[in-house]
């Protein structure tokens, strides 16, 4: 599915389920990592995560589009468009849109850890960020620090 097909699908869902036209742009944003989609308040455009279409299929994407269209139509009408607002929750229930999307199953890359050891006393240091061991000394004995991995 490309952006033109997504635009057409969004316009069709808006007319069928909401009875109102969608007059802005809907497109895939490949930079989205964890969210299914987002409604942009300033431009009124809807950005969607292509990974949800690939992993969960068209039905999940339709649910995300409905969710974002709830934000869209309520915001344009001047009603409560935030997740906690009653207007938003009522409209979600009316159109059958999910409140949250199914989490992605793709594996998250494990953060790299760095291990350092004092050459004198053997004190170990595990860090999430790399450091230059020549600039630091052991906090226990002031000995030299060596990088293990």
Swiss-Prot record:
Residues annotated as the enzyme's active site: 68
Q: Report the co-factor binding details.
A: Binds 1 zinc ion.
What does the record give as cofactor?
A: Zn(2+)
Q: Where in the cell is it found?
A: Cytoplasm
BP term (GO), one:
response to stress
User: Which GO cellular component terms, listed alphabetically, does the Swiss-Prot or TrEMBL entry include?
Assistant: cytoplasm
Protein residues bound to Zn(2+)? 67, 71
Q: Where is the SprT-like domain?
A: 6-147
Question: Predominant location of this chain?
Answer: cytoplasm
Q: What is this protein called?
A: Protein SprT-like
This chain's source organism reads: Bacillus velezensis (strain DSM 23117 / BGSC 10A6 / LMG 26770 / FZB42)
């Amino acid at each position: 599915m490309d952006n033109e097909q997504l635009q057409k699908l969004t316009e069709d869902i808006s007319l069928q389920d909401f009875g109102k036209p969608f007059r802005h742009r809907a497109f895939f944003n490949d930079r989205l990592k964890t969210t299914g989609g987002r409604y942009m308040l300033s431009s009124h455009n809807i950005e969607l995560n292509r990974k949800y279409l690939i992993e969960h299929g068209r039905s999940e994407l339709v649910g995300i589009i409905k969710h974002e269209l709830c934000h869209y139509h309520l915001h344009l009408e001047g009603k409560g468009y935030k997740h906690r607002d009653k207007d938003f929750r009522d409209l979600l229930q009316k159109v059958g849109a999910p409140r949250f999307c199914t989490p992605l199953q793709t594996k998250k890359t494990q953060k790299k850890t760095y291990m350092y050891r004092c050459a004198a006393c053997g004190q170990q240091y595990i860090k999430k960020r790399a450091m230059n061991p020549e600039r630091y000394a052991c906090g226990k004995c002031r000995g030299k620090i060596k990088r293990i991995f």
